[in-house]
């Protein structure tokens, strides 16, 4: 009772003191390509835009493994699986900034606008997206959605061309973020539509303040966020490509969270009483994409030889330092349609040389990024190991280190031979790997880095999405995995463990297995 009385006595004194603003600084590894998330597909850009600024109709709860309400409070699906009716949450505020003052809350017009700009080539906003809509196109959204219409001020009807078991989880992906139609109208009337990509407006937990490329992104907490004001007043992305420097900043207190640490830094952090290690198995696959449109990689035997030449065990130990498991196919092993009966390519340089006998092989290019990431902790070393393995099998290759933004842009154009890359599933559905990485539509959008278009594989992917039961889908996806393995479209590398390092005073942060970031409930203890 004394403790309670003492607390009550102090309360007025505590309330009289102005609270110091709490800032959460996150050391990230790269700059976002922009903030109009529909134009991009990298996690770096999704983290800096969709994850902090925007919301979607639904979200995917990684812990529960289910789709949960967000801007849509509830939804219903017709018996034929073609019509989805969404009831929108009322009273959701878009961000109020120096450059935009919303006159209304979110309604059906915003949802219709957000989808129509991706779906309708005649829509004026479709034409101003300089980078197109790669993720929506690779997921075949224009072919899937027949129409999106307003059926009430806070109700939207989406009608599909055909049933698709992946549609609802797809709506949790970053590219399905909902924009303010009112802000878009303001920009179009002012003749500055490009500002949607540089001065973003959303309804999410944080409000955009400023971006300095390769240095910093600044955000402020959204006091009107429908799920409650964030626990911190400001969020900073301190762009720090060097993992060693990220750790140094964390130790000095310049950052409270450091993303994508090197495996050795994780072990070092475990011994530091001021730091915490957060981790989870990542729903991701690191791989080298083999561009099947570039001879001699158009020959399956050459691609198979590359897989046989590669020493995966040595690579994992040297690059991931024991923090990842070997990838033998496209899926992480915890995927529900993972085909366990498909054997890995063994490390067999002699067999690789036999497959290449008599072939005149030009020198190949190995493309990699300059700075490390979760899916590629040591890009330079990894590329050198692959180069040496290929040389042992009689394949000459040179290494090109290319800045991340340029690498993605040029890889989408198919300029690469061998490309170190990684893919993170967004929602736990197996199709989230297949459609964006192996469909013919995704060759056009640029995300199919193997540049492989096969009608038989396309049919397996389409049939898998249309199937009504998980058992049917699993059978189809097993066939797809077998075809991809036989054609050797990828050189699978690893399934990493996702790590983040935080200071002890950080509370409420969790690592997401899909690589998404949620800082809305993260607090910094004083």
Swiss-Prot record:
Disulfide bond annotation, renumbered to this chain: none
Biological process per Gene Ontology, one example term: protein transport
InterPro entries: Peptide/Ni-bd (IPR030678), SBP_5 (IPR039424), SBP_5_dom (IPR000914)
Protein keywords: Peptide transport, Protein transport, Signal, Transport
Database matches in CDD domains: PBP2_DppA_like
Keyword Protein transport applies: yes
One GO cellular component, as annotated: outer membrane-bounded periplasmic space
Subunit record text: The complex is composed of two ATP-binding proteins (DppD and DppF), two transmembrane proteins (DppB and DppC) and a solute-binding protein (DppA5). Five orthologous SBPs (DppA1-A5) are present in P.aeruginosa, which increases the substrate specificity of the DppBCDF transporter.
Official protein name in the record: Probable di/tripeptide-binding protein 5
């Amino acid at each position: 009772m004394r403790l309670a009385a003492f607390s009550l006595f102090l309360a007025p004194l505590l309330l009289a003191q102005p609270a110091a603003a709490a800032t959460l600084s996150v050391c990230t590894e790269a700059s976002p390509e922009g903030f109009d998330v529909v134009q991009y597909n990298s996690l770096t850009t999704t983290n800096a835009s969709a994850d902090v600024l925007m919301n979607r109709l639904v979200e995917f709860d990684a812990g529960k493994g289910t789709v949960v309400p967000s801007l849509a409070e509830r939804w219903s699906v017709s018996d034929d699986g073609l019509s989805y009716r969404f009831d929108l949450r009322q009273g959701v505020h878009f961000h109020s900034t120096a450059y935009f003052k919303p006159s209304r809350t979110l309604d059906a017009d915003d949802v219709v606008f957000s989808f129509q700009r991706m779906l309708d080539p005649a829509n004026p906003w479709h034409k101003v997206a300089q980078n197109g809509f790669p993720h929506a196109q690779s997921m075949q959204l224009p072919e899937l959605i027949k129409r999106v219409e307003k059926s009430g001020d806070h109700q939207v009807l989406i009608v599909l061309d055909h049933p698709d078991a992946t549609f609802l989880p797809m709506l949790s992906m970053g590219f399905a973020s909902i924009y303010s139609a009112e802000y878009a109208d303001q920009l179009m009337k002012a003749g500055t539509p490009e500002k949607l990509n540089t001065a973003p407006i959303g309804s999410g937990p944080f409000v955009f303040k400023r971006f300095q490329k390769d240095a910093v992104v600044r955000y402020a907490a959204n006091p009107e966020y429908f799920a409650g004001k964030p626990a911190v007043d400001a969020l900073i992305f301190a762009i720090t490509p060097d993992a060693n420097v990220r750790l140094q900043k964390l130790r000095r207190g310049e950052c409270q969270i450091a993303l994508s640490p090197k495996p050795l830094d994780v072990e070092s952090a475990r011994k530091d009483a001021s730091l915490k290690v957060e981790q989870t198995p990542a729903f991701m696959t690191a791989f080298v994409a083999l561009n099947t449109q570039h001879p001699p990689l158009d020959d399956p035997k050459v691609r198979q030889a590359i897989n046989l030449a590669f020493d995966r065990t040595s690579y994992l130990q040297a690059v991931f330092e024991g923090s990842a498991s070997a990838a033998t196919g496209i899926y992480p092993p915890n995927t529900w349609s993972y085909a366990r009966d498909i054997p890995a390519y063994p490390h067999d340089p002699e067999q690789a040389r036999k497959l290449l006998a008599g072939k005149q092989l030009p020198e190949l290019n190995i493309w990699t990024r300059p700075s490390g990431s979760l899916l590629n902790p040591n890009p330079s070393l990894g590329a050198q190991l692959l180069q040496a393995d290929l040389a042992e099998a009689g394949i000459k290759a040179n290494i090109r280190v290319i800045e991340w933004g340029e690498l993605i842009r040029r890889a989408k154009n198919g300029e690469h031979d061998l490309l170190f890359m990684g893919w993170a599933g967004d929602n736990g559905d197996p199709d989230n790997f297949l459609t964006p990485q192996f469909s013919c539509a995704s060759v056009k959008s640029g995300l199919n880095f193997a540049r492989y278009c096969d009608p038989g594989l396309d049919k397996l992917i389409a049939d898998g999405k249309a199937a009504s039961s998980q058992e049917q889908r699993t059978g189809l996806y097993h066939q797809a995995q077998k075809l991809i393995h036989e054609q050797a479209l990828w050189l699978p590398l690893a399934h990493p463990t996702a790590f983040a390092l935080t200071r002890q005073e950080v509370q409420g942060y969790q690592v997401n297995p899909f690589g998404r970031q949620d800082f809305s409930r993260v607090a910094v203890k004083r």
